[in-house]
Design a protein with these regions (language model features):
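Terminal low-complexity/charged segments
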Residues: 1-155
Length: 155
């Protein structure tokens, strides 16, 4: 069984945590960016798996852990250090966070300088109007049905 471990870190502690994971042989899996619509801040989620430790755990009890580093409360203009010097495979994720969310990721090893995606609106994932938010919330509500189920099923 897979177990997920979430560790919240600050921007200042990100590189030291990544360096520690690299030191024990953890592999980078993915990075996910999202915007908090309530306060406008951003969150980054970095996922790693320590393959060596996972093999040992699976052999013992069938379990293994996915490790996640969570950086929350990021202001759009705050500088976020790239982890690409430790994990070069992060480059598409960091470029995506820059292009779609407008996040200021610094010192990327492979930096597309805003041209990783061709988008018609700059930073499209950072924009949400009150109308769009209301429409999303409305579409999430399930319609209620007053008709008894046996009539709907033809019983």
């Amino acid at each position: 069984m897979q177990k997920a471990i979430y560790t919240t870190v600050g921007i200042d502690g990100l590189l030291s945590h990544v360096q520690a994971l690299k030191g024990v042989g953890a592999r980078f899996v993915q990075m996910h960016a999202e915007r908090n619509v309530d306060d406008g801040t951003y969150r980054l989620l970095y996922t790693f798996i320590n393959v060596r430790a996972a093999r040992e755990q699976i052999a013992q009890d069938g379990n293994y852990a996915i490790e996640n580093l969570v950086v929350e409360g990021i202001d759009q203009h705050q500088e976020i250090p790239s982890i690409s010097s430790y994990y070069p495979a992060v480059f598409p994720f960091e470029n995506e966070a820059h292009d779609l969310f407008g996040l200021a990721i610094t010192d990327m090893q492979i930096d597309f300088k805003g041209f990783f995606y061709q988008v018609s609106t700059a930073e499209p994932m950072s924009v949400i109007t009150p109308e769009v938010k209301a429409a999303r919330e409305k579409s999430m509500k399930l319609p209620t049905c007053q008709t008894p189920a046996f009539l709907l099923l033809g019983v």
